[in-house]
């Protein structure tokens, strides 16, 4: 039995089970990957939309399901759920074609049944994506590539791992966070995009805590803040090396330009000490001995001077009636 015969045998099984209540569409389909379609349809693998049969369009029209038509798809065996849009109604009756990444998220095998029902989702405002590998971040402008690729999607579901194709390379991206709900519509929505560190990066594999002194991983590419390390390299010019300090100390002994450093003239004729210079320091013991000797000499000189001054003062002191006297008898 070929695929067409198998599909015809399923028509009686799946048709007529599409009403889940007033205004609600629900039906079972056999799931097959996009690769079962002609080659010109294989580009649908890097999108988030499915193909349904024409009978599904008729049923949706009778139920007045309005555009955009969004669906919740689930695997009744594993219980996995996701969301999607519909691109065309050209599939064979009883068949639903899905991108391979979507089947992998739902843990579906070829030909297994899936439940499809219409859904109403809020417009998304924020999405955080985590690439599986770092090569996606190495693209010159990954954010622009992602925003352009998301035009092929109608919905996003938290924890799904979507696939996009860029320059003949497949990139797998995990949906880490969504706002305002865990499943959103991105059709005509103004959505902010952010990146988590890739799964194979150190920022994603190393545990992070918020305790003081620990590194905290930030958004986008894993910038790291933290306290300054004590073993960090010195800032240039902030700390001198030993040989530099020695050279600086040696340079202090070298003559430098000093203003008014000429020899001064004194009124008493003695040679003055040049301004801006200071006599070299001598040994403290010699200085003390010299100072003591100088003090003793000064004391002796002072004593001699005082004696000489006393004798001079006595000789030059005015004395009354000190002349030679004469008697009247003479």
Curated annotation (Swiss-Prot):
Residues 198-330 are annotated as: Disordered. Functions at a post-ubiquitation step in the ubiquitin fusion degradation (UFD) pathway. InterPro entries: Ufd1-like (IPR004854), Ufd1-like_Nn (IPR042299), UFD1_N1 (IPR055417), UFD1_N2 (IPR055418). Residues 206-222, 283-310 have a biased composition (Low complexity). GO terms for molecular function: polyubiquitin modification-dependent protein binding. GO terms for biological process: ERAD pathway; proteasome-mediated ubiquitin-dependent protein catabolic process; ubiquitin-dependent protein catabolic process. Gene3D superfamilies: 3.10.330.10, Ubiquitin fusion degradation protein UFD1, N-terminal domain. It comes from the Eukaryota. This is Ubiquitin fusion degradation protein 1 homolog. GO terms for cellular component: VCP-NPL4-UFD1 AAA ATPase complex. Belongs to the UFD1 family. The gene is ufd1. Pathway: Protein degradation; proteasomal ubiquitin-dependent pathway. Keywords: Ubl conjugation pathway.
């Amino acid at each position: 039995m070929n695929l067409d015969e198998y599909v015809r045998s399923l028509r009686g099984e799946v048709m007529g089970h599409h009403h889940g209540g007033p205004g609600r569409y629900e039906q079972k389909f056999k799931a097959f990957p996009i690769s079962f379609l002609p080659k010109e349809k294989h580009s649908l693998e890097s999108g988030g939309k499915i193909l349904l049969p024409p009978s599904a369009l008729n049923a949706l029209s009778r139920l007045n399901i309005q555009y955009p038509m969004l669906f919740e798809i689930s695997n009744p065996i594993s219980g996995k759920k996701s969301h999607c849009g519909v691109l065309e109604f050209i599939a064979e009756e009883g068949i639903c074609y899905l991108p391979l990444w979507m089947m992998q998220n739902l843990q579906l095998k070829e030909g297994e049944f899936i439940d499809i029902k219409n859904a109403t989702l809020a417009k998304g405002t924020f999405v955080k994506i985590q690439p599986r590998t770092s090569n996606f971040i190495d693209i010159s402008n990954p954010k622009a590539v992602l925003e352009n690729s998301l035009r092929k999607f109608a919905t996003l579901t938290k924890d799904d791992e979507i696939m996009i194709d860029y320059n003949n390379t497949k990139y797998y991206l995990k949906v880490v966070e969504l706002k305002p709900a865990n499943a959103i519509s991105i059709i005509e929505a103004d959505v902010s995009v952010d990146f988590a560190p890739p799964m194979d990066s150190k920022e994603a594999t190393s545990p992070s805590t918020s305790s003081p002194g620990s590194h905290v991983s930030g958004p986008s590419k894993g910038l790291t803040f933290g306290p300054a390390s004590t073993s960090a390299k010195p800032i240039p010019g902030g700390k001198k090396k030993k040989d530099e300090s020695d050279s600086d100390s040696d340079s202090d002994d070298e003559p430098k330009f000093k203003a008014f450093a000429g020899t001064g003239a004194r009124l008493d004729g003695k040679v003055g000490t040049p301004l801006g210079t200071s006599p070299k320091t001598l040994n403290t013991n010699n200085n003390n001995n010299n100072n003591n000797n100088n003090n003793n000499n000064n004391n002796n000189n002072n004593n001699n001077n005082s004696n000489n001054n006393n004798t001079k003062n006595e000789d030059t002191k005015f004395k009354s009636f000190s002349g030679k006297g004469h008697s009247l008898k003479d």
